[in-house]
Each structure stands twice: as structure tokens, then as C-alpha cells.
């Protein structure tokens, strides 16, 4: 399971945190740091193969892949690799609490926007 987040949601989260950054750092010996770490994520983990299938559907919709694209023929499943984790999940409750922001672009919509951008930027595939 992976927590995928649309890039515009990431940018919005960063901008919100940056506009409210503390003015100055406290002395290193201080008990608390003036800066906080915030997770920015969609908080809705999905299976990697579900992500890939959804991306395939959106690429077909934008005519970047043929209608009869055979995902299985282009898929090679490997065992867990060094550094892989079984699941990732972003707890965004501090971000929502402190900045009133929670990434909200659903996976399908984010991949649809990506496919449209890709087609507009690179052009249709031949």
C-alpha cells in the first residue's frame, strides 16, 4: 500500500506552511524547535497495482496507450527490494490542525490530470 498525492496538493501544502514559518530560530539549547515537520499526503493508501491500473486507464483515455494495451504483458512483479516498506501512510492531522489544509485530490482525478498534462506537454503518441 502506498500513499500517493497529487503534486498540486503537495505544492499547496508547502505554500501554506511557508507563509506561516517562524520568523527566527531559537537557540540550539532551547527546549523546543521553532519549526515543525508536516506530512503532506493524501492519507488514502492504495495497492501499487491498483495505482498502475488506474494510470493505464487514464493513459488509454488520453490516447497515450492503445485501447488494447496488455498490462500483464508489460508487468514484472519482483520480491520486496532492500528499503521497501509494506505500506506508507501520511498522517496529515497536524497539517490540517495548524493550517486548515488537507490534500483532497482523489487518485483517479490526479492521474487523469497528469495524463492530460502529459498529452498536452509531449503530444499524442504514435
Report residues per predicted region.
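C-terminal substrate-binding subdomain of Rossmann-fold SDR/epimerase-dehydratase oxidoreductases
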Residues: 1-126
Amino acid at each position: 500500500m502506498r500513499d500517493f498525492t497529487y503534486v498540486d496538493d503537495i505544492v499547496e501544502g508547502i505554500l501554506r506552511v511557508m507563509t506561516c514559518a517562524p520568523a527566527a530560530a531559537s537557540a540550539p539549547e532551547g527546549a523546543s524547535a521553532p519549526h515543525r515537520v508536516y506530512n503532506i499526503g493524501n492519507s488514502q493508501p492504495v495497492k501499487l497495482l491498483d495505482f498502475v491500473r488506474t494510470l493505464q486507464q487514464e493513459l488509454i483515455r488520453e490516447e497515450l496507450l492503445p485501447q488494447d494495451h496488455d498490462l500483464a504483458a508489460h508487468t514484472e512483479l519482483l520480491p520486496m527490494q532492500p528499503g521497501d516498506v509494506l505500506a506508507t501512510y501520511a498522517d496529515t492531522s497536524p497539517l490540517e490542525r495548524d493550517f486548515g489544509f488537507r490534500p483532497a485530490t482523489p487518485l483517479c482525478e490526479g492521474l487523469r490530470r497528469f495524463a492530460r498534462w502529459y498529452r498536452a506537454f509531449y503530444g499524442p503518441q504514435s
